[in-house]
């Protein structure tokens, strides 16, 4: 038990940041049977498959070593009878166990200290929540002049992923295992967009692929770690957890030689130093906002492109980074079009017999609904054509009318809920019109009738009941407070659950 505590008590030492070698040792049995550890969030994770237990992984790896079937290559895996007969089962079990183990150092930040100690949560400086983006767009974006719109590229070779994990994982066998999986089933497009995955392996092993993608993105974000001491607005993950300290300092030395071939890092820090900067990211899209000038942002662009090409040994296309001036361009992020406009304000000032008119321009952030991409998504889901004209959608004959209307209404309510942070919500009326008429045409098609005849027989109130937004429901529930609620709904409202409902593709498959 003392040996386990040496691994788990990260508050004492940060030298054991990665626990993957435990999967090849007998400590794994203690992990599985320890009551304190079994009550942790690792064992209670609903996304973990019970069939892929750590004991099964341990026994499987031991069996592979004993039978000497682990020393194989992707070229002869098809001829190997051990691997060929149980290829799908073994790959899923091992990949789940691998992903489970490598998540331990990150999950242990929330686990209480073991055996008799006063329960306390180990504190770590971590990335801010994704929901901190919403107040940033509303409160802070208007204070910046330029933003770098960055699209994080895919790694061009699987060896880049292995090299990234090499500084975390100290066990050579685990790296060979990962390299074998990636060469056997590699499909990076399916890693990024699992819904379009063509590989059955990537569909069954989302946990492993999600970890690999997060580690890849985390390596790209490591470039901003050194700015943490320069700006209190920039939060980054604690470097002791993510990087080997020697490797981290070696990375900083490369920053010096990007522009000037000198050894003094502080003398060249002015190239990228800014008292107030913000960095936010959602999925592959990241933004670096600054109050600096266009020259300053071009320096940052050159710095990012050069460093990423040097560090990852790949060609980083400069067109993946756009320099946008907020006063002239809109920023597309999180399904919104954000822009900064000047709101003129005239103030009359009078001193004795003299009066003056003072013109003040106040910056205001507009978050708009991208109506054209939204209509394109509806057209792709067969709710309308490319011009936005509603069309009937083929449905199963066993679906009832109320079920069909409820599904259309759920899509509209989710879209209305997601875009509640928009400063101008009139664009949603177009979406409501498309879904409402598409629902009517779908029902008319089912009953082999026309839309006019169908609505005349059942009444238009039927659709209004199911295509009712949250605003309408609230007004009907509290009619006396309708005037106050109207003022509230004219403003932006950011709901904390919109991250899980922002994809229209989740609903089109239900028809």
Curated annotation (Swiss-Prot):
Pfam families xref list: Intron_maturas2 (PF01348), MatK_N (PF01824)
Entry superkingdom: Eukaryota
Keyword Repeat: no
Gene Ontology BP annotations: mRNA processing; RNA splicing; tRNA processing
UniProt-recorded name of the protein: Maturase K
Protein's gene: matK
Compartment annotation: Plastid, Chloroplast
Keywords tagged on the record: Chloroplast, mRNA processing, Plastid, RNA-binding, tRNA processing
GO molecular function, one term: RNA binding
Family to which this protein belongs: Belongs to the intron maturase 2 family. MatK subfamily.
GO cellular component, one term: chloroplast
Signal peptide: none
Functional note: Usually encoded in the trnK tRNA gene intron. Probably assists in splicing its own and other chloroplast group II introns.
Keyword tRNA-binding in annotation: no
Species whose genome carries this gene: Paulownia tomentosa (Princess tree)
InterPro entries from the UniProt entry: Domain_X, Maturase_MatK, Maturase_MatK_N
């Amino acid at each position: 038990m003392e040996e386990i505590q040496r691994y788990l008590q990260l508050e004492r030492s940060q030298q054991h940041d990665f626990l993957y070698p435990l999967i090849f040792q007998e400590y794994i049995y203690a992990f599985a049977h320890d009551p304190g550890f079994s009550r942790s969030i690792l064992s209670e994770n609903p996304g973990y498959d019970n069939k892929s237990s750590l004991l099964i992984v341990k026994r499987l790896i031991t069996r592979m070593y004993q039978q000497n079937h682990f020393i194989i290559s992707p070229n002869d895996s098809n001829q190997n009878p051990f691997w060929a007969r149980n290829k799908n089962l073994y790959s899923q079990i091992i990949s789940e166990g691998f992903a489970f183990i490598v998540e331990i150092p990150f999950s242990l930040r929330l686990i209480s200290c073991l055996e008799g100690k006063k329960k306390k949560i180990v504190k770590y400086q971590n990335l801010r929540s994704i929901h901190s983006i919403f107040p940033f767009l509303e409160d802070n974006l208007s204070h910046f002049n330029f933003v770098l719109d960055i699209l994080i590229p895919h790694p061009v070779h699987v060896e880049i992923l292995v090299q990234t994990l090499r500084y975390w994982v100290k066990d050579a066998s685990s790296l060979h295992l990962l390299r074998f999986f990636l060469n056997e089933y590699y499909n990076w497009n399916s890693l990024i967009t699992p819904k379009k995955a063509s590989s059955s392996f990537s569909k069954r092993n989302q946990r492993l692929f999600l970890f690999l993608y997060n580690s890849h993105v985390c390596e790209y974000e490591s470039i901003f770690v050194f700015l943490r001491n320069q700006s209190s607005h920039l939060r980054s993950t604690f470097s002791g957890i993510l990087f080997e300290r020697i490797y981290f300092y070696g990375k900083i030395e490369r920053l010096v030689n990007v522009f000037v071939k000198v050894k003094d890092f502080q003398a060249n820090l002015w190239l990228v130093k800014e008292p107030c900067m913000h960095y936010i990211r959602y999925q592959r899209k990241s933004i670096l906002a600054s109050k600096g000038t266009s020259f300053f942002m071009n320096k940052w662009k050159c710095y990012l492109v050069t460093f990423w090409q040097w560090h990852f040994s790949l060609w980083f296309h400069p067109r993946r980074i756009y320099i946008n001036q907020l006063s002239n361009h809109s920023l597309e992020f999180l399904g919104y079009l954000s822009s900064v406009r000047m709101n003129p304000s005239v103030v009359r000032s009078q001193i004795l017999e003299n009066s003056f008119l003072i013109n003040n321009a106040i910056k205001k952030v507009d978050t708009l609904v991208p109506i054209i991409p939204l209509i394109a998504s509806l057209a792709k889901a067969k709710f309308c054509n490319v011009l936005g004209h509603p069309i009937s959608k083929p449905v199963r004959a066993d679906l009832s009318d109320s079920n069909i209307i409820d599904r259309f209404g759920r899509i509209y309510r989710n879209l209305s809920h997601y875009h509640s942070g928009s400063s101008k919500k009139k664009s949603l009326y177009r979406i409501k019109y498309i879904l409402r008429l598409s629902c009517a045409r779908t029902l008319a098609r089912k009953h082999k009738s026309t839309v006019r005849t169908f609505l005349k027989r059942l009444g238009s109130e039927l659709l209004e009941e199911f295509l009712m937004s949250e605003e309408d429901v609230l007004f009907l529930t509290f009619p006396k407070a309708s005037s106050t609620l109207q003022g509230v709904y004219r403003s932006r409202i950011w709901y904390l659950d919109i991250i899980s409902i922002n994809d229209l593709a989740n609903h089109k498959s239900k028809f």
